[in-house]
Amino acid sequence: MVLDGYAVSIISWNIIDFGRTKDDQEIEFIASIVRDFDIIAIQEVVAHDPAGAQAVARLADQLNRMGASWDYVISDPTDSPSSQISERYAYIWQTNKVSLSYEPMLVDKLSGLCDREPYYARFTRDDKDYDILNFHARPHDRDPQSEVQALSNFIIDNQIRFNWILLGDFNITEEDEVWEALYAESFRPSLSHQKTTLKRACDEGLYLNVPIDNIYFSEVKNTVQQSAAIDFVERCENLSEMREISDHLPVSINLD
């Protein structure tokens, strides 16, 4: 839900295997979830097949048909150790709500330190900049902590001129000690103890698994009006079908 009076609303979503696996009905369903936000950040856009970029274009087209005016950008494939690991990122935004300041870019300085280097974009609203790093970490058993440490160092070294918003799928929780460097610089997670991934099957009526998707922001430069994980599953009977959309919940934040 987006409240009145906010400055900007952002939603981040790891949409599993976002490409030809998503039919028109699924694209329409995704659009119905993200349509009320100003900026949409997507992880796991398929890189090895043009259908990944085409899926982003299809989603933007569906959003435009819903009444607002939207634009989008898609990253190049990440500079990953293998083509199986490489992905694209995407941003989609409401053009009457925010403007894109310049061409987004993969952060080359982090390409040797992260399996999938983050995708940077600066959006502006009412003369305030929002410098977004869109990121998908390596799996939890392959040391995503070292990637987060590299991201933290990059943000801290460049924080004077930037209003960093770090978002995505980090494959670690907000309580991992690797975040302490950012927390010491007044960065905070938008969600706490909020599970954001889906189990393969319900367990005693429970289908949420681990809290690894989040949005990190500077509380010196921003005030959070609201943050949430959007549960599009709602009940166990829907789990199998909804996992075809994604095995992650989207996470959102409204900033003053």
For each of these PLM feature ranges, what is it?
Residues 48, 156-165, 172-256:
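Metal-dependent phosphoester-hydrolase catalytic domains
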Residues 42-44, 66-77, 103, 162-169, ...:
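Surface-exposed patches in mature extracellular/periplasmic domains of secreted proteins
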Residues 1-88, 145, 149, 239, ...:
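N-terminal, active-site-proximal structural segment of metallo-dependent hydrolase catalytic domains
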Residues 15, 44-45, 137, 169-171:
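Active-site metal-binding loops of divalent metal-dependent hydrolases
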Residues 137-151, 175:
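Active-site-proximal segments of metal-dependent phosphoesterases and phosphodiesterases across multiple
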Residues 75-119, 123-124:
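Extracytoplasmic mature domains of secreted/periplasmic and thylakoid-lumen proteins
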Residues 35, 39-42, 58-68, 97, ...:
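Sec-exported extracytoplasmic/periplasmic mature domains
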Residues 2-10, 95-100, 113-137, 255-256:
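Beta-strand-turn-beta hairpins that frame and shape the catalytic cleft
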